Amino acid sequence: MMYEADATSNESARPAGCLRVLVVDDAPDVTELLALMMSHAGYEVAMAFSAAEAFDAARAGRFDAVISDIGMPGMNGYQLAEALRALPGYERTPLIAVTGFTHQEDRERARRAGFDDFLHKPINPSDLLDAVRKLCG
């Protein structure tokens, strides 16, 4: 099930080209923390707790960026990125991987799947916001 997180009044901190962000992680506490980081920065945030749920949300609505875990049961983050890249309107949407995977091979696989950036957990809020701003700006 997808949930919306309220954006705060810090809209001046976000770039005009990136308003709606989808956050995806199978760990609800991580999903909620990432969504909180983004909403405090002024973004409108939707949350999904699986890659399949995120793909359904992307088909149903438009997101300006997607922040996704990689290691999820069922459809994983790599598969989600590939599916999103094949979805009309998502060919150039910024996709950011947030993961506990730390090897260079993981980073390379993420790029091949369609991710634009790759951040290691635990996530530093400023690193996440910088990545979103860089890709959306």
What spans do the regions from the language model cover?
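Charged docking surfaces used in two-component/phosphorelay signaling
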Residues: 32-40
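Active-site beta3 strand of CheY-like receiver
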Residues: 62-67
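Active-site residues of response regulator receiver
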Residues: 69, 99
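Receiver (REC) domain active-site loop signature in two-component systems and cognate sites
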Residues: 72, 84
